Amino acid sequence: MSTLLHLSASPRGAASESRAIAATFLDAYRETHPDDEIVEWDLWDGSLPEFGPAAAAAKMAVFAGADPQGDEARAWRNAIDTFRRFDAADRYLFSVPMWNAGVPYILKQFIDVISQPGLVFGFDPEHGYTGLLEDKKAAVIYTSAVYGPERGPAFGADFQRPFLDDWLRWTGIDDLAAIEFRPDLATPDADTGRRAAHAAARDAGKLF
């Protein structure tokens, strides 16, 4: 039995396009994976620890082979606990709206909290980084209100998908699927794209 963790980066609840497409994906997944566990994680639920001075100092201490102390130790434990919650799953679904050409800051906060040496990555001065997440796969739902790949620069740029795809591969997760719905506000026939995105999510969910 596998565990699929859905991480939602949209704070818009029932009005969220990315969450609606994710629901279609998950319904299809349940049909073909009836014994698997599905866990929901709303990244806006207040459970993410902050990643401030103590956490940054703890990360560098661990990088240097030292043990964090005091506030740094507490921040490090919070990072480990957050990572373990993520690592408990072997399949991931991210629903990610575009914010200002990139990802919502809550998703960046999540990434900053768990991207720690010995947890998500290893590092060798000669050979560089090694992703430590093995035997995992991820699907990502990308939505945008205005940006579209065939629209001009006045409609924005995409630092959303390149960033998250690169981070996932950096962690060691290179079995990736993506469903895109864009744009949903700047296109007269948005319903056509919406239906196509839900159909793609349904197909991807069944095969995931």
Map each language-model feature to its residues.
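Short, structured loop/turn "capping" segments at alpha-beta junctions
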Residues: P117-G122, D174-D175
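Cofactor-binding loop segments of dinucleotide-utilizing enzymes, especially the Rossmann-like FAD-
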Residues: A9, T143, F181
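Glycine-rich phosphate/pyrophosphate-binding loop and the adjoining helix
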Residues: E150-F208
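Residues at the starts of beta-strands that form the adenosine-phosphate
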Residues: T3, E37, K137-A138, D175
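Short, well-ordered alpha-helix to beta-strand connector turns
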Residues: A89-D90, D135, I173
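N-terminal beta1-alpha1-beta2 submodule of the flavodoxin-like/Rossmannoid cofactor-binding fold
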Residues: M1-V96, A101-D112, Q116, A199-F208
